């Protein structure tokens, strides 16, 4: 130390500045190199995952060649997988992620690293329980979703049309891989119940019933007519439509028929309609679903306790509202009549109504389309189709004007699908230019939980459009609470069936306590939840996580809490598992 004592202060100051400059430069270079190395890893991971099948690639990227990705031969892939290989690969990814100097990563990359670590750790935990995976199902199964995904396959170039036609020829080998998987499940005592089988077969038979008037032909012709890159002549359109119809007759319909026949041959080899709890490893698999789909890692007992508390809270609020106004239900019935806006007008109103609670978007262009008449019975009242990540357009909301919902319910649905729901959340997240892997590795609990959370705001906004907003406010609040209670009840039943081992009788007793006695209604609720484990919790447990996170932030910040800024932070972080979201909200 004495050596430096005699150095003039000015020189010492210059030396220190010089030393700091060098060290900062070295550190900066190291920071950059570590972030660059991490980004190279995520880009490589994205390219690997996005090319798994043609549908994933096409729906994710409009121009894969601009990212150095060569389109592989058009294929739907296979339903078969090697659990040991998958586990090993996930563990390798986890090991590589842990090799990065975490403290030297930017906050954005640390967040991505946390999300990926949890994602691959969770996937690796599945192991042999992957045998309980079920690709088929009456509502959400592959055989139900595939025609819709094919029908909505965007034609941007002539190559897209060529790929689409090739995909039709791969439906049969893809379904054959599912048949092989189902035979393996049958041999292991894991095949579906005859009740579920009947529901799937009914759908397959419906699809093949009128081969000469299949709705996919109509939609293909409609898309060809609209294609302009460059446009086809009438003669070329006719030739392509003829070829398409031939593929439907010789490839797609036979594939569905073969699937139906093969499944029928396995009738009786499955157990009666029961939840996952009745299968070996079923409870562990259900926990895996909660983690991988819902993004929650809290004990099941804690989830049940929170659900029960919310159910009681909603019930008490409903009772209080009815006590204040015994004619509230009559007022609610009037509300739907007063909300006379068209879907287009509803979507135009929502961005303006939500300004006080949610950040305004820079650009929120979208298209509103009507579901093709032949697809109405298969689809929900409305749904949002996400755009490719490299174009971010078009943002498309489909309206199914089948008349199955009231105007108030439709308004809530459009808030869920549009503003401030899925469309708004997707566009908000994209404005931050996240890494591509964030679009592939996501969290359904965040995505559906957010849309359900903001749906409650949608109901509130609807009240402001009524003839008498003040009296409508409580009536519309009643409607939301009723919806919340239904979702909560179904979520508790989901846990009861798949984790606690409830059978149909036990489920009926539970529903009876809430005044649901109709035998066919009870049977339908039970069967749907048996076939879709964890599905309701993606929506409702996700919703409660956002609700609770808001309460935590309100308590911590007190008068400094700003609802719009709270929402902005959630949107900036984007879809991640809830432990990761909570970490970065602090």
Regions found by a protein language model. Give the residues of each.
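N-terminal Lys/Arg-rich, disordered targeting/topogenic segments
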Residues: 1-7
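N-terminal maturation segment of proteins
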Residues: 7-586
